[in-house]
Regions:
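Internal, hydrophobic cores of structured domains that mediate oligomerization or house catalytic pockets
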Residues: 109-165
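Secondary-shell segments that build the walls of catalytic and ion/ligand-binding clefts
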Residues: 1-76, 149-297, 303-327
Length: 327
């Protein structure tokens, strides 16, 4: 058997050092994402301040459909994103096998890349819904985005109805009556949303990569003050980084193998992909929370609405608040 050379030993030590450094950065960033969980768990108790920009977005708009049409539509995606980031943090912490830790030592690459894609896309949706400075457009996007959700829901109805049709005896059940009532209410909501669309400016609704790119482009134009990165607004800016991330992670989500072309050295490249994905997802989520809070707070007066987000986001909250006057 050939003995390892000095160069082999040096390369092994260097790789180990790189791995440890990357894992430390990944863990630190993932924990930042998990620090948003208290906000996600409690913000709905007092969603917005009276007199805030978001409160005025909601006031008198689509009240037959929901009392919080704009704020409520924007809230769910970022809560979904934070849940994914919390799972990422737990997954990364659980792999630590250094020292006395008895973690798996497994990168769980597919799981981490899938979760971070989910988080980034959901957080980007909140940014996209709220970033337009025109109240009429924010209202329009909330209505049209909700309508697009209902369009997707129709496929669920079709499969559910087919199941009941396949087993006619079930049509005497409480479950079938509840399903019919749900469809009736669904049809009513569709009509309400049609009226809402007639009352607001036209706007295109997209999802996935478009939303991620749109949110990242907005951040290039309005750099978050809590993030010292010099990436924003460059010729190759955050929009480009986010698009690259989304393409690669989407391939993993759909079971495609082409990302393996960019892992010639195996573990190190894999670890770098994970840390980049965590960075982008946490950045999107922090910015979504800050943008929501910039519009949810009444900055002209003191209120008893609790501050649930990390203090580090405050500079971005204050800077972006100026873009959304309540009146």
């Amino acid at each position: 058997m050939n003995q390892p050379t000095l160069a082999d030993l040096f390369a092994a030590v260097a790789n180990r050092a790189q791995r440890v450094e990357i894992l430390q950065r990944t863990n630190a960033k993932a924990k930042r994402g998990a620090e948003l969980k208290p906000w996600a768990m409690q913000v709905k108790r007092q969603l917005v301040d009276p007199g805030s920009s978001l409160a005025n977005d909601d006031d008198g708009f689509m009240t037959d459909y929901a009392g919080d049409m704009v704020s409520g539509t924007a809230l769910f995606p970022i809560i979904n994103a934070i849940d994914s980031l919390t799972a990422v943090s737990e997954l990364i912490d659980g792999r630590d096998d250094s020292g006395d830790r008895k973690g798996s030592g497994d990168h769980h690459t597919s799981s981490n890349l899938t979760l971070t894609r989910m988080a980034a896309e959901s957080a980007a949706t909140t940014i996209w819904l709220l970033s337009n400075p025109d109240r009429a457009m924010r209202r329009s996007l909330s209505v049209r985005f909700t309508a697009s959700e209902l369009n997707a829901q129709r496929a669920f109805h079709r499969s559910t109805r087919k199941r009941f049709d396949q087993y006619p005896d079930t049509k005497q059940s409480v479950a079938y009556r509840e399903f019919l009532e749900h469809v009736r209410l669904f049809d009513e909501r569709v009509e309400m949303l049609k009226q809402g669309m007639q009352q607001t400016p036209k706007a295109n609704v997209s999802d996935g990569g478009f939303v991620v790119a749109a949110a990242a482009k907005w951040l290039d134009q309005h750099p978050p003050q809590h993030d010292p990165s010099d990436l924003y607004g460059n010729a190759y800016g955050f929009e480009d980084v986010a698009a690259r991330f989304y393409n690669l992670n989407s391939a993993i989500v759909h079971g495609l193998k082409w990302p393996l072309d960019y892992m010639p050295n195996g573990e190190i490249q894999m670890a770098r992909m994970i840390v980049e994905s965590v960075n982008i997802a946490v950045t999107m989520a922090e910015c979504a929370v800050a943008l929501f809070e910039a519009q949810a707070q009444n900055h002209a007066t003191n209120t008893d609405r609790p501050i649930l987000y990390p203090d580090r986001l405050q500079p971005s909250v204050e800077t972006w608040a100026a873009l959304y006057p309540p009146d």
